[in-house]
Amino acid sequence: MSQKTVHDQDNALLLETGNTKVAPPPRYQVLLLNDDYTPMDFVIVVLQQFFAMDLKKATQVMLHVHTRGRGVCGFYTREVAESKVAQVNEFSRIHQHPLLCTMKQA
């Protein structure tokens, strides 16, 4: 909601409110990319730890990534998506796996 400052005849401060619509921020897909070296169990751990998936959902997404080459982990604002991508890539690097996480605008 926006406010407009107006002064009346007695120089008193009045505020006028208007209905200004703000567009929602753009959403980004966070994606995992398949590789031939990262164990499936590690991918499931990543999905559970960083994307709050239960075991069943994490297994479904992991199998999708494995069979189709990539899979969507979630939709987020740009800053959150960037943070998740960085966290997953760092976690993979620390554990010496080549798993890659990326993002694209939805």
UniProtKB/Swiss-Prot annotation:
Regions crossing the membrane: none
Pfam families: ClpS (PF02617)
GO biological process: protein catabolic process; proteolysis
InterPro entries named among the record's database cross-references: ClpS, ClpS_core, Ribosomal_bL12_C/ClpS-like
Record region (Disordered): 1-23
Domain of life per record: Bacteria
Biased amino acid composition, Basic and acidic residues: 1-10
SUPFAM superfamilies hit by this protein: ClpS-like (SSF54736)
Gene3D superfamilies on file: 3.30.1390.10
NCBIfam families the UniProt entry points to: PRK00033.1-5
Known partners and oligomeric status: Binds to the N-terminal domain of the chaperone ClpA.
Described purpose of this protein according to its UniProt entry: Involved in the modulation of the specificity of the ClpAP-mediated ATP-dependent protein degradation.
Protein family (similarity comment): Belongs to the ClpS family.
Xref: HAMAP family: ClpS (MF_00302)
Protein name: ATP-dependent Clp protease adapter protein ClpS
Organism lineage string: Bacteria, Pseudomonadati, Pseudomonadota, Gammaproteobacteria, Lysobacterales
